[in-house]
């Protein structure tokens, strides 16, 4: 039995970054079709301006990055906190462009790695196109972003929210949501319960 799983992700989320390896491992271990989709967090819209946030908020932010770094360090990853709050629509739409041209895995790895090394501005269209070219995609991303790609990105964001998604990473199996990389264990249990074949022993 093959299971279809949707993974909603955002390149500027530290938790999505560290969950990437767990998602790849899930695909390696189970007979699943894992479809990555961009869910772009508009942080300023739901958390307010930076100036308006209280000390309690910043304590939570500091803890979140400390926690994500624990997982990143275990994977040998570099996770440097971003210098500003981004609305990463360009780099997120790049995911769709990479999928269209068969270079998703290369782009996915590069996009996460470069952002968390502070080596790319996810809002810079030219920088995202250069990343796509490096991954093996053809030129043409700016037009795609300005046209059908941007429309599809926004449609998917609405679709995600309509299905209950509120954060990343979120795995969806037959309508059931598993939010956070630390829920992958529960997702694995659900796959076993449903009789999804394993590609190899756990």
Placement of each model-derived feature along the sequence:
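Short amphipathic alpha-helical segments at helix-loop
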Residues: 8, 49-53, 141
């Amino acid at each position: 039995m093959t299971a279809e799983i949707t993974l909603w992700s955002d390149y500027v989320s530290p938790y999505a970054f560290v969950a990437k390896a767990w998602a790849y491992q899930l695909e390696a271990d189970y007979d699943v079709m894992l479809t990555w989709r961009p869910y772009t967090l508009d942080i300023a819209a739901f958390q307010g301006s930076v100036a308006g946030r209280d000390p309690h908020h910043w304590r939570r932010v500091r803890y979140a990055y400390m926690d994500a770094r624990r997982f990143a360090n275990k994977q040998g990853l570099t996770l440097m906190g971003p210098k500003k709050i981004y609305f990463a629509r360009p780099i997120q739409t790049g995911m769709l462009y990479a999928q269209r041209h068969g270079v998703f895995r290369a782009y996915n790895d590069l996009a996460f790695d470069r952002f968390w090394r502070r080596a790319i501005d996810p809002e810079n269209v030219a920088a995202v196109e250069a990343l796509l070219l490096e991954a093996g995609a053809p030129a043409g991303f700016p037009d795609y972003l300005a046209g059908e790609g941007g429309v599809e990105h926004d449609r998917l964001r609405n679709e995600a929210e309509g299905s209950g998604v509120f954060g990343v990473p979120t795995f969806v199996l037959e309508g059931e949501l598993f939010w956070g990389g630390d829920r992958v264990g529960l997702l694995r249990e659900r796959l076993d319960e449903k009789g999804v074949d394993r590609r190899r022993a756990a």
